[in-house]
């Protein structure tokens, strides 16, 4: 996730708040000073990333089409929105599910990448073993039950380790005498329950593809 203001607080870690919840953007969502924070500080919004077919919107809508079942929802439980905390994570989700492993096949990809302001969502933390969070379709049942548990408790969504990225593969890059790998960290998937007409997105890429080097960072289904 990317903070959309320059005065953001440190990124919260998954499960970093009491009660198994993750604050995705701090305690306020308005772009103005927070009470008790002092002058010159502003609330920060959180940018998440969504990969989508360029012919369609970046989120699923209520009553528009039938969303296929996926890790965190069964058939008929949508809409559920799936986003990633990094652009690489969003691309990896697509590559994993389409089983694109060949660099030559990658050259034909034309997809949109959206930057989505998810504000200050207070997300539940998925409390499942790593092998369940990152497993194949056989692990989906347990993940769906976990999503139902949080949804019935009133959560607007949850955050979980990315199933599509290998461990440590969400580190990105930094510039120091040229491009250097960033510090290793695990990617996160952001799951939002229901239609979300309140969210704003920007098309960062209209018809593009990821760098071929990302293929080595993808955890494929088999």
Segments the model singles out, each with a brief description of its role:
Residues 2-3, 13-15, 19-75, 97-222:
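Active-site and NAD+-binding cores of ADP-ribose-processing enzymes
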């Amino acid at each position: 996730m990317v903070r959309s203001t320059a005065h953001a607080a440190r990124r919260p870690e998954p499960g970093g708040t009491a009660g198994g919840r993750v604050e995705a953007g701090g305690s306020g969502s308005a772009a103005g000073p927070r009470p008790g924070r002092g002058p010159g500080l502003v609330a920060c919004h959180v940018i998440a990333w969504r990969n989508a077919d360029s012919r369609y919107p970046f989120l699923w809508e209520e009553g528009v089409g039938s969303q296929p079942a996926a890790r965190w929802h069964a058939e008929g439980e949508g809409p559920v929105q799936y986003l990633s905390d990094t652009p690489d994570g969003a691309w990896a989700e697509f590559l994993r599910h389409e089983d694109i492993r060949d660099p030559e096949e990658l050259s034909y990809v034309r997809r949109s990448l959206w930057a989505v302001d998810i504000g200050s969502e207070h997300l539940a933390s998925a409390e499942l073993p790593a092998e369940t969070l990152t497993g194949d379709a056989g692990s989906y049942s347990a993940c769906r039950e976990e999503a139902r548990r949080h949804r019935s408790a009133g959560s607007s969504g949850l955050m979980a380790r990315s199933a599509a990225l290998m461990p440590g593969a969400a580190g990105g890059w930094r510039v120091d005498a040229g491009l250097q790998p960033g510090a290793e960290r695990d990617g996160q998937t952001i799951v939002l329950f229901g239609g979300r007409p309140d969210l704003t997105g920007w098309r960062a890429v209209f018809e593009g593809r990821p760098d071929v080097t990302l293929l080595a960072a993808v955890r494929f289904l088999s």
